[in-house]
Amino acid sequence: MITVPVVPAATEYLYRQATAAGIPLSGTFELTPVCNMDCKMCYVRLSRQEQEAIAPLFGAEQWLKLGRSAVDAGMLYLLLTGGEPFLHPEFRQILEGLHRMGLFISVNSNGTMIDETVVAWLKNCPPVRMNISLYGASDQTYERLCGNPRGFTQVTKAIRLLKEAGIQVKLNCSLTPHNAADLPEMVKFAQENELILQVATYMFPPVRKDSAMIGKNHRFTPEEAAYYMAYADYLTLGKERFLTQEGKIPTPSDPEEGCQGDGIACRAGKCSFWVTWQGHMMPCGMFPPEQGPNVFRMPFQDAWEQVKQDSAAVRLPPECANCSAKNTCRACAAMVVTESGCFHKVPKYRCDMIHAYKAQWDRVKEEML
């Protein structure tokens, strides 16, 4: 079973070149915070009434104008996300217009709004990939975690329709105490459907939705998160590959340049950006949005230059730079700021989780083998 997407060498080359040149190769447009589900751990979700009380949504004309400006600046890869992007009133016009620009477009969706009519339309402007969230293996779990008593039925139908239409699907699983018992069945579902399933047991604190949630979420304890990280490795990798890990967290085959504890080590703010539903450009979607320039009120290139400068100025905890686990922990700037409220304090939850991994890997090995 493939557990992570395979990135072509040409794509990696483009990212390296764009990082060196400061070109915004990759972008994310967060079209709306509105979602028809209410997942307990979500960092952005608002109801329609909550969204309207804050600000109106930007329309297709504005998003397409932004898309053209981003393309002119070098953007080639684009992720459309939300909330649930299919709930944007002009989502079809947005996707069709961006598709005509020749972009490699991926779409994040919970899958519940994708039916035969939607798939017939998508076949005319197909994304290169649909990233579908899989939150459980039963309608009961979806109701418990997401407040949707028909969620699993809807999502599995969407996945079947997308596959039949020849549209690539990747499954993302956010694992929490509310759906952990379903993990074996979710892995089995992915295997039977020959799909990538990427399991995350670390949940970012939802500080964008509630500033009082620094260091908190509806999530596992650090030790539980480490256990389920190891358990997910066992289920997805298989016995032999799991044992070859010897309790070590796999290191990326092509790690990012830079060093954690120094500056931002990922591509955020170097060759990638995120635009929130209110128009704030940020290095990534987990950063506090009020700090980012508004791309609907200033030229795209000016906003990008500001984000690059702000990102370059970020310095992470020096303790992380000297930590023996830094290459496997990969505590990014977003983790640091959402766990601690600033960039110079160690993200204790993440730190505890990573340092607990070996003992929890041993526990999984003992239980499973």
Question: Across the structure, where does each feature detected by a protein language model lie?
Answer:
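Flexible mid-to-C-terminal extensions adjoining Fe-S/redox cofactors in radical SAM and related proteins
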Residues: 2-14, 23, 285-369
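Short Gly/Pro-enriched turn/cap motifs at secondary-structure boundaries
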Residues: 19, 261-266, 311-314
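Short loop/turn motifs at secondary-structure junctions
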Residues: 38, 74-75, 126, 167-168, ...
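Short glycine-enriched, charge-decorated loop/helix-capping segments at active-site entrances
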Residues: 48-57, 144-150, 214-215, 338
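Residue-level signal for the nucleotide or nucleotide-sugar donor/cofactor binding architecture
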Residues: 58, 89, 150, 178-181, ...
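Radical SAM enzyme [4Fe-4S]-AdoMet core and its adjacent flexible, acidic
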Residues: 128, 133-135, 140-269, 274-282, ...
